[in-house]
């Protein structure tokens, strides 16, 4: 008799049950691992799968997490370069791709990452045909469109992390300005996750008090308090972090876990995430941009119709045209 047999006697033969909330992270770079640890620390999955082409790095990262299993609620952490390890995932977070270099725009990255997606997406679909795809790789809006096209999934199951982080950066900066917690500062960044994002100044409020009623010039050129600078800091935020530490990771990882939580817990929370916006706010082309969306167990269930000022709508359309200009050149 083995030690195990001496110690444990089975009452019944356990039937293998599938995981209810299996989360897969594709890509174990800085963003992938920050997303993985954020998901684990928030107890959002009963199994975590990691996938990457770099086998040693993948094995090392998985072992490192497994060694901490005692401190986590999730003890099943698996990793392989073979996508069969991802089978039956509820949410698949795609962070893989070429990393943005210092000074490189997110749009520059695009064709490099499209080619990577041509391998990744069909493999995800093969093993988790009912999953929700959460795309994080940059340029996220274009790559969410690419993932949607390559997967054949309905649009509600392909979501881009979009401006969820930009809006968090914006609310953090508002909080600093007013010495308040970011959760008490309300403001939305929509459009492209990147250089042409749009700050919805008309919706910025604290405790329901619209700041534009207190400062009608807020966000405009004639604003003595120069609030426009706050939005510029949001746009420059990632570039600044990349310049200082070489990459961004923690905030985007926490942002990803925030989105995963709304999905797996069916919270019906509203997030600014990237979705198909064709036919909304004057956008004519088949592009993905961030607007406020409701996330739950089925994925992206609803879209909130924002009241945008003509200037804000114009910026959104311009953002869409910029993305479409790049998209139509892509070879899928």
Curated annotation (Swiss-Prot):
Coiled coil: none
Entry's Gene Ontology molecular function annotations: L-lactate dehydrogenase activity
Binding residues annotated for substrate, in chain numbering: 106, 138, 169, 248
Active site: 193 (proton acceptor)
Binding site for NAD(+): 29-57, 99, 138
A single cellular component GO annotation: cytoplasm
GO process annotations (BP): lactate metabolic process
InterPro entries: L-lactate/malate_DH, L-lactate_DH, L-lactate_DH_AS, Lactate/malate_DH_C, Lactate/malate_DH_N, Lactate_DH/Glyco_Ohase_4_C, NAD(P)-bd_dom_sf
Compartment list: Cytoplasm
EC number: 1.1.1.27
Keyword Oxidoreductase in annotation: yes
UniProt main location, coarse: cytoplasm
Pfam families found in the cross-reference section: Ldh_1_C (PF02866), Ldh_1_N (PF00056)
Pathway participation: Fermentation; pyruvate fermentation to lactate; (S)-lactate from pyruvate: step 1/1
Reactions mediated catalytically: (S)-lactate + NAD(+) = pyruvate + NADH + H(+)
Keywords: Cytoplasm, NAD, Oxidoreductase
Protein's job: Interconverts simultaneously and stereospecifically pyruvate and lactate with concomitant interconversion of NADH and NAD(+).
Matches recorded under HAMAP family: Lactate_dehydrog (MF_00488)
Family membership: Belongs to the LDH/MDH superfamily. LDH family.
Record text on subunit structure and interactions: Homotetramer.
Name the record gives this protein: L-lactate dehydrogenase A chain
Organism listed in the record: Fundulus heteroclitus (Killifish)
Primary gene name: ldha
């Amino acid at each position: 008799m083995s030690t195990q047999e001496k110690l444990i006697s089975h009452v019944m033969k356990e039937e293998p049950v599938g995981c209810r909330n299996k989360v897969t992270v594709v890509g174990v770079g800085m963003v992938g691992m920050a997303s993985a640890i954020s998901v684990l620390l928030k107890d959002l999955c009963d199994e975590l799968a990691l996938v990457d082409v770099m086998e040693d790095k993948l094995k090392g990262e998985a072992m490192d997490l497994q060694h901490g299993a005692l401190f986590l609620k999730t003890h099943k952490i698996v990793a392989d370069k073979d996508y069969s390890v991802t089978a039956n995932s509820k949410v698949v977070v795609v962070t893989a791709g070429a990393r943005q270099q210092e000074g490189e725009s997110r749009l520059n990255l695009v064709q490099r990452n499209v080619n990577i997606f041509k391998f990744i997406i069909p493999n995800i679909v093969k093993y988790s045909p009912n999953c929700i795809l959460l795309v994080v790789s940059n340029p996220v809006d274009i790559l969410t469109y690419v993932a949607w096209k390559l997967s054949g999934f309905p649009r509600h199951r392909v979501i881009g992390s979009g401006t969820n982080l930009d809006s968090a950066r914006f609310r953090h900066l508002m909080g600093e300005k007013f010495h308040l917690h970011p959760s008490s500062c309300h403001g939305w960044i929509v459009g492209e996750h990147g250089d042409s994002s749009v700050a919805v100044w008309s919706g910025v409020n604290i405790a329901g008090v619209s700041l534009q009623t207190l400062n009608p010039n807020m966000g405009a050129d004639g604003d003595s308090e120069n609030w426009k600078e706050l939005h510029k800091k949001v746009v420059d935020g990632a570039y600044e972090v990349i310049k200082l530490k070489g990459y961004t990771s923690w905030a985007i990882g926490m942002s990803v876990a925030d989105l995963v939580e709304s999905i797996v817990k069916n919270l019906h929370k509203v997030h600014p995430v990237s979705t198909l916006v064709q036919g909304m706010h004057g956008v004519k082309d088949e592009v993905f941009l961030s607007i406020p969306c409701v996330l739950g167990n089925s994925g992206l269930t609803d879209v909130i119709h924002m009241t945008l000022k003509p200037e804000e709508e114009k910026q959104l359309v311009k953002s869409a045209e910029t993305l479409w200009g790049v998209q139509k050149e892509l070879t899928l």
